């Protein structure tokens, strides 16, 4: 009887890529969704901000309480790396600890039943992965680590400096995936617009875009995590003019007040940030996503109102909102002028109302239109509905199109279809597949 593995990948999609590398190292295990029957349980943790850390710990404790006797519980990833000394002392529930350096050695650690924290942060090169969750879409990691010095962010302390993958490695990985039927790709990293700057080469994202365009069999691609100070008009133009990359721009701006951007050590002011955003918005059929932090130390009422005014004037398609999380080891942690939690909550509520309104407006732009959608399968909303994703959207984060009728028989998961959008139901669109 084959051994069974239950795996949980928390946090970002970059973490998911590393989880998929671990899965490929454990071919003798059969995946199970039921932790109680697993011989091996792996949790790839997130250590980014307070709520993510709490979720990681809670997941490990919950799985420990449900595991069967003689099973092995592994805690891997960012949280494990960031607090390796404390966790190993305080969590006897865990059998094997490993951080962000040993994903490709997970089979060895399990067979030897030993913990390991390599000094070097792991970056995928040509290793096999078992893609999860899709038969047509895959995430591609551009780089690991980050050279930015944002005041609020602890990631460089456990993910290290920027290390980029060579273009030829990325191209080969995509070719291998295309040969297996994958056709839609999302490129991820901590800072995608700094790709290959660790080799002293600027604007290499443009070279990557052109290299990917040469690969036969790709239907679509998009890039996440552009950093404002390293994003250039040339990059925007390369995406806008690409036959493969959709006009998708995800650039976390975090704030728009000059004084706050300076406190956050973002390396760019409001004017240049706005110039980039307006250039992105000027691209036909562009889709803009950003992230904002509310309540960073020193955020005055004036700073906040400036952000509110900008958001009401410049409409994003999607916005991730984060309450400031006070992370030890960061520059912001040492700052005075901390914002009271109740003020942060009030400001979050104001922004959340704007975000929801803008998302509905963005969705309603498609009412009455026929759009290209990937078919993802049966919707979780109802077994009578199919689930689609607009071609330009990133998976999981940008939304779902509920398909309630089709002029075509025998629809295939992973295929692109023309879907006529009939209505909006809450935060979802409803449409019909057209012949």
Curated annotation (Swiss-Prot):
<feature type="domain" description="MTTase N-terminal">
    <location>
        <begin position="3"/>
        <end position="115"/>
    </location>
</feature>
<dbReference type="GO" id="GO:0005829">
    <property type="term" value="C:cytosol"/>
</dbReference>
<dbReference type="InterPro" id="IPR005839">
    <property type="entry name" value="Methylthiotransferase"/>
</dbReference>
<feature type="binding site">
    <location>
        <position position="12"/>
    </location>
    <ligand>
        <name>[4Fe-4S] cluster 1</name>
    </ligand>
</feature>
<dbReference type="GO" id="GO:0103039">
    <property type="term" value="F:protein methylthiotransferase activity"/>
</dbReference>
<feature type="binding site">
    <location>
        <position position="153"/>
    </location>
    <ligand>
        <name>[4Fe-4S] cluster 2</name>
    </ligand>
</feature>
<dbReference type="InterPro" id="IPR020612">
    <property type="entry name" value="Methylthiotransferase_CS"/>
</dbReference>
<dbReference type="InterPro" id="IPR012340">
    <property type="entry name" value="NA-bd_OB-fold"/>
</dbReference>
<dbReference type="Pfam" id="PF04055">
    <property type="entry name" value="Radical_SAM"/>
</dbReference>
<dbReference type="InterPro" id="IPR007197">
    <property type="entry name" value="rSAM"/>
</dbReference>
<dbReference type="InterPro" id="IPR023404">
    <property type="entry name" value="rSAM_horseshoe"/>
</dbReference>
<keyword id="KW-0808">Transferase</keyword>
<keyword id="KW-0949">S-adenosyl-L-methionine</keyword>
<feature type="binding site">
    <location>
        <position position="46"/>
    </location>
    <ligand>
        <name>[4Fe-4S] cluster 1</name>
    </ligand>
</feature>
<keyword id="KW-0408">Iron</keyword>
<keyword id="KW-0479">Metal-binding</keyword>
<dbReference type="GO" id="GO:0006400">
    <property type="term" value="P:tRNA modification"/>
</dbReference>
<feature type="binding site">
    <location>
        <position position="150"/>
    </location>
    <ligand>
        <name>[4Fe-4S] cluster 2</name>
    </ligand>
</feature>
<protein>
    <recommendedName>
        <fullName>Ribosomal protein uS12 methylthiotransferase RimO</fullName>
        <ecNumber>2.8.4.4</ecNumber>
    </recommendedName>
</protein>
<keyword id="KW-0004">4Fe-4S</keyword>
<dbReference type="InterPro" id="IPR038135">
    <property type="entry name" value="Methylthiotransferase_N_sf"/>
</dbReference>
<comment type="function">
    <text>Catalyzes the methylthiolation of an aspartic acid residue of ribosomal protein uS12.</text>
</comment>
<dbReference type="InterPro" id="IPR005840">
    <property type="entry name" value="Ribosomal_uS12_MeSTrfase_RimO"/>
</dbReference>
<dbReference type="InterPro" id="IPR006638">
    <property type="entry name" value="Elp3/MiaA/NifB-like_rSAM"/>
</dbReference>
<feature type="binding site">
    <location>
        <position position="146"/>
    </location>
    <ligand>
        <name>[4Fe-4S] cluster 2</name>
    </ligand>
</feature>
<dbReference type="InterPro" id="IPR013848">
    <property type="entry name" value="Methylthiotransferase_N"/>
</dbReference>
<dbReference type="GO" id="GO:0051539">
    <property type="term" value="F:4 iron, 4 sulfur cluster binding"/>
</dbReference>
<dbReference type="GO" id="GO:0035599">
    <property type="term" value="F:aspartic acid methylthiotransferase activity"/>
</dbReference>
<comment type="similarity">
    <text>Belongs to the methylthiotransferase family. RimO subfamily.</text>
</comment>
<dbReference type="Pfam" id="PF18693">
    <property type="entry name" value="TRAM_2"/>
</dbReference>
<keyword id="KW-0411">Iron-sulfur</keyword>
<dbReference type="InterPro" id="IPR002792">
    <property type="entry name" value="TRAM_dom"/>
</dbReference>
<dbReference type="GO" id="GO:0046872">
    <property type="term" value="F:metal ion binding"/>
</dbReference>
<dbReference type="Pfam" id="PF00919">
    <property type="entry name" value="UPF0004"/>
</dbReference>
<feature type="binding site">
    <location>
        <position position="78"/>
    </location>
    <ligand>
        <name>[4Fe-4S] cluster 1</name>
    </ligand>
</feature>
<keyword id="KW-0963">Cytoplasm</keyword>
<feature type="domain" description="Radical SAM core">
    <location>
        <begin position="132"/>
        <end position="361"/>
    </location>
</feature>
């Amino acid at each position: 009887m084959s051994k069974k593995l239950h795996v949980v990948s928390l946090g970002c999609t970059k973490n998911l890529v590393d989880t998929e590398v671990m899965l490929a190292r454990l071919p003798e295990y059969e995946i199970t969704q039921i932790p109680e029957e697993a011989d091996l349980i792996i949790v790839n943790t997130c250590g980014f901000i307070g709520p993510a850390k709490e979720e990681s710990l809670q997941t490990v404790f919950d799985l420990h309480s449900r595991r069967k006797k003689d099973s092995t519980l592994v805690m891997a990833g960012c949280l494990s790396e960031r607090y390796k000394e404390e966790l190993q002392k305080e969590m006897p529930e865990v059998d094997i600890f490993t951080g962000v350096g040993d994903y490709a050695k997970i089979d060895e650690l399990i067979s030897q039943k030993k913990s390991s924290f390599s000094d070097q942060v792991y970056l995928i090169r040509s290793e096999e992965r078992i893609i999860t969750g899709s038969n047509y879409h895959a995430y591609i990691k551009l780089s690991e680590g980050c050279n930015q010095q944002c005041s609020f962010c602890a990631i460089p302390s456990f993910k290290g400096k920027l290390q980029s993958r060579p273009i030829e490695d990325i191209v080969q990985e995509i070719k291998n995936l295309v040969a297996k039927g994958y056709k839609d790709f999302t490129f991820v990293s901590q800072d995608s617009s700094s790709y290959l700057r660790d080799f002293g080469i600027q604007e290499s994202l443009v070279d990557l875009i052109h290299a990917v365009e040469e690969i036969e069999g790709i239907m679509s691609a998009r890039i996440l995590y552009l950093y404002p100070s390293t994003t250039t008009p040339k990059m925007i133009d390369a995406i806008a003019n690409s036959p493969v990359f959709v006009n998708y721009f995800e650039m976390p701006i975090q704030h728009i007040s000059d004084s706050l951007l300076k406190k956050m050590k973002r390396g760019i002011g409001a004017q240049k940030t706005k110039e980039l955003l307006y250039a992105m918005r000027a691209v036909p059929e562009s889709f803009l996503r950003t992230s904002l932090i509310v309540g960073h130390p020193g955020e005055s009422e004036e700073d906040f109102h400036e952000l509110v005014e900008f958001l009401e004037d410049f409409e994003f398609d999607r916005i991730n909102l984060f309450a400031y999380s006070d992370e030890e080891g960061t520059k912001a942690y040492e700052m005075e002028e901390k914002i009271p939690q109740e003020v942060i909550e009030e400001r979050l509520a104001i922004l959340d109302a704007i975000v929801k309104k803008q998302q509905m407006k963005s969705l309603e732009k498609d009412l009455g239109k026929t759009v290209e959608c990937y078919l993802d399968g049966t919707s979780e909303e109802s077994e009578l509905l199919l689930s689609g994703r607009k071609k330009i959207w990133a998976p999981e984060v940008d939304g779902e199109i509920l398909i309630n009728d089709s002029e075509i028989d025998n629809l295939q998961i992973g295929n692109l279809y023309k879907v006529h959008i009939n209505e909006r139901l809450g935060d979802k669109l409803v449409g019909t597949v057209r012949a």
